[in-house]
Amino acid sequence: MQNTTKRDLERLINNKTSNTSLADILFLKFSSDTGTILNFGRRGSLFAPEAILNVVKKMACHNLLKWSDIELANSALENIDFKASQKSLALQIEQTLAAQARTQKFVYLGGGHDYIYPTVKALNRFTKKMVIINLDAHLDTRTDPDPNSGTPFRQIASEFDGDLEIIQLGIHDFANSISTMSNLSRAREVVATYEDVRFGTKDFTETDKFLARVIPYQKETVYVFSLDADALESGIMEGVSAVNHRGLPYDFVEDVLLYAIDELKCQHFGIFEYNPVYDNLSQKGARTLASLIYQIMDDRFFT
């Protein structure tokens, strides 16, 4: 027991604060899988935020940055009126962001990918120019009449007030219907399939050149990094609703993340759709995602 206490002093758990106003990094947790279930996905992503953070807490700490977390999902309301719950959550996120004068990095942990919609809706209150970088096997632009984890980017595109670009990386034709691929109403959408990414980076060896061409830096633009865990190859990511047998390699995903941080000055990061129920006993998926979060929490990216 004494060894555990001593070791925790050198782990990230020691930098956690219960006072969110003191946090340099804030995790907004969405511990619900209602949107995934409405999209006919497998139950279990509601456990993802805690499963991922439990791994993060044990990682060695090499800076003095404070972090905190807050739970915002309201599964009870979601089960009664999902549309109303999304509007309510967008307001909650907006109020949370407005109150965080000190925080420089925000990490949004789902839950289903439906949570990117209220997140962007809230961010739209602070900016009229945004680029979303979505790493995913699916476009998540379904034309379903009722919202779910497969519809968020079509919802975002139809409601965004301003200049919006959605860059989709790692998409598979076999995972997206013709209607899903139909044009978005009020946003520019750039789609780079798995094949486009693979050949554009020369088998993932020239990622920086590819990213500089596809996602050039634009001034006065808010960048949002959004990762659906099923974008990652199944060898490292089994714990998802739809396992990707031809997914992106970890190094590429990390390169995109680092490019977003270093070159695009990104402050908003979403990680969605991880399902610990279907992960293996080694928590391989949670450890993979925690490694990405560890990069976000590195102090070399803070001013």
Spans of model-derived segments:
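Conserved alpha-helical scaffold segments that buttress catalytic/binding sites
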Residues: Q2-T303
